[in-house]
């Protein structure tokens, strides 16, 4: 209600982990939260939702990331990050589990915004690929979080070089390619990076999907949005829950039921 704030669990990778668990998939959260009320709250919620939290570290020296999300009349959001730097950005290689073949690792660019999390995240992506697993990357750009904004593009590009699939908004795609034409921007990104799939979400207009040799558009049902927070994460969760049931990445036609 007006003048009140609601405490909600969140963070894009946590949202995806919960979404996968709700779709009867096996998911785990790798990361750090503060050993504080917000961190314990997130740990409790993820555990209750069926997410494996054995690799969620409670950091006694840094506070849990806390974000105020404001909504406009159309349900669109603005973000204010209250804790800088927060516990999640102090993830180290010692916090990473052993990865295995056929597993999926999903992450966003906030993990790249500061050391030591940046090198740890890139190391995790490489380790998952080396183990025979797959990597999903959603830039989910939040420039205000970055210690050095000039590092955003090179870090995002480094992650795209290690990803099997990527999910971007149109705005993120155009920013990365310096283009304003959707099909050519997608083709440009696919030519620059070794992605198997590129997904560009378009809100009420659905999603564009690209492989190295093909593109298609998948429309969505019309809805009246109340709050778009986590909508992209819900899309990724559904996609990964479906892909995780397969031994290999499918051809584009075989991917359609997941979209």
Feature annotation, model-predicted:
Residues 20, 169, 232:
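Short, conserved phosphate/pyrophosphate- and ester-handling motifs at nucleotide-, phospho-/glycolipid
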Residues 126-127, 178-259:
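Conserved phosphate-binding/catalytic region of the ribokinase-like
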Residues 110-188, 195-197, 205-206:
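Conserved beta-alpha-beta core of the PfkB/ribokinase-like small-molecule kinase fold
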Residues 26-27, 53, 133-135, 215:
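Hydrophobic anchor at the start of a short beta-strand
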Residues 15-26, 71, 242-244:
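Alpha-helix C-terminal capping segments
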Residues 18, 66-70, 206-209:
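Short beta-strand scaffold segments in enzyme catalytic cores
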Residues 2-18:
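Short catalytic helix/loop segments, enriched in acidic residues and glycine
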Residues 26-109:
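Conserved N-terminal subdomain of the carbohydrate kinase-like
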């Amino acid at each position: 209600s007006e003048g009140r704030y609601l405490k909600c669990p969140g963070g894009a990778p946590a949202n995806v982990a919960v979404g996968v668990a709700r779709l009867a998939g096996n998911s785990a959260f790798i990361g750090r939260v503060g050993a504080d009320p917000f961190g314990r709250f997130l740990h409790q919620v993820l555990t209750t939702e069926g997410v494996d939290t054995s690799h969620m570290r409670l950091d006694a020296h840094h506070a849990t990331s806390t974000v105020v999300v404001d909504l406009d009349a159309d349900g669109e959001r603005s973000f204010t990050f209250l804790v800088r730097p927060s516990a999640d950005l102090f993830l180290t290689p010692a916090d990473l589990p052993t990865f295995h073949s056929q597993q999926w690792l999903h992450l966003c660019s906030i993990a790249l915004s500061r050391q030591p999390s940046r090198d740890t995240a890139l190391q995790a992506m490489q380790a998952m690929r080396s183990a025979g697993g797959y990597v999903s990357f959603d830039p989910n750009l939040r420039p205000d979080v970055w210690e050095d904004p000039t590092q955003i593009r090179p870090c995002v590009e480094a992650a795209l070089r290690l990803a099997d699939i990527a999910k971007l908004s149109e705005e993120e795609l155009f920013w990365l390619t310096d283009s304003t034409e959707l099909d050519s921007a997608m083709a440009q990104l696919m030519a620059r990076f070794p992605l198997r799939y590129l997904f560009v979400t378009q809100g009420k207009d659905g999603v564009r999907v690209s492989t190295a040799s093909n593109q298609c558009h998948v429309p969505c049902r019309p809805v009246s949005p109340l709050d778009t927070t986590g909508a992209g994460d819900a899309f990724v969760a559904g996609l990964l829950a479906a892909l995780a049931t397969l031994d290999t990445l499918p051809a584009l036609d075989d991917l359609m039921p997941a979209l």
